[in-house]
């Protein structure tokens, strides 16, 4: 009798294991680098559910282009406008678009270095002109921060002066140029600056020079694991995920904020 009960228990365990294995999925995720530090914290926690994440990073503009041209990933994370465009173009399952977080742009310098005054647009302009080199994302790479910074320089009337001494980042944090001594100032999304050791954030871009970018996720129409993709999006709105998002310098959407 005892042997029969042991065999029965083992049978139930095997069935449960097989069911869990069947539910587990390998999710290919194409994501903006602005969420890289969030993934560093949350990917292992989501993978504890049995799913596995394969993360590929690309600027938001490049994500739209690559997916539009036929590249398939299970879940996409980009700017909200990028996800909306891909949904309208039939690349993202309608109704899966989920606002994840918003991020402003900031300024960083080498840790321990004097922090320039960036309290006003005019002070920020003077700080840029005084720097030996300024690092920001290459606008041609398709990232939101690079495109906005190009507009800021044009508005301040210093595009020529800054670009003559600029270090343009492509696929690397702009703060890495500061760490290597190749730039005095780095400008990028705040979470990306906070993710680089050896630099200190001076503060956000001043006044109306600031640009807050909302980021969203969505499930690709050709995903092999759409249910697992939806589970990932739901997880990113959980209290545990919200805490990690805030800790990495992003702002969760109002409806998702912990009370």
Roles of regions detected by a PLM:
Residues 13:
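Short, flexible active-site-proximal loops enriched in glycine and acidic residues
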Residues 25-72, 77-81, 85-90, 98-103, ...:
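Exported/periplasmic ABC-transporter solute-binding proteins
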């Amino acid at each position: 009798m005892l042997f029969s009960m042991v065999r029965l228990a083992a049978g139930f365990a095997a069935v449960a294991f097989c069911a869990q294995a069947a539910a587990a999925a390998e999710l290919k995720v194409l994501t903006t680098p602005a969420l890289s530090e969030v993934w560093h914290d949350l990917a292992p926690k989501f993978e504890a559910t049995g799913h596995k994440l394969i993360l590929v990073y690309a600027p938001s503009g490049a994500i739209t282009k690559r997916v539009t041209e036929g590249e398939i990933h299970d879940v996409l994370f980009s700017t909200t406008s990028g996800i909306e465009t891909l949904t309208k173009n039939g690349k993202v399952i309608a109704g899966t678009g989920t606002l994840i977080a918003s991020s402003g742009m900031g300024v960083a310098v080498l840790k321990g270095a004097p922090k320039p005054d960036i309290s006003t647009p005019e002070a920020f302009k003077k700080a840029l002109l005084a720097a030996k080199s300024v690092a920001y994302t290459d606008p041609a790479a398709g990232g939101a921060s690079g495109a906005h910074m190009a507009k800021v320089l044009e508005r301040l009337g210093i595009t020529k002066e800054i670009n003559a001494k600029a270090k343009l980042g492509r696929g690397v944090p702009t703060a890495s140029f500061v760490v290597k001594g190749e730039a005095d100032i780095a400008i990028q999304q705040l979470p990306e600056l906070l993710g680089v050791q050896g630099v200190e954030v001076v503060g956000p871009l001043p006044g109306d020079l600031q640009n807050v970018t909302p980021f969203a996720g969505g499930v690709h129409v050709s995903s092999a694991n759409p249910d697992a993709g939806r589970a990932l999006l739901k997880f990113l709105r959980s209290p545990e995920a919200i805490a990690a998002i805030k800790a990495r310098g992003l702002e969760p959407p109002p409806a998702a904020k912990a009370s």
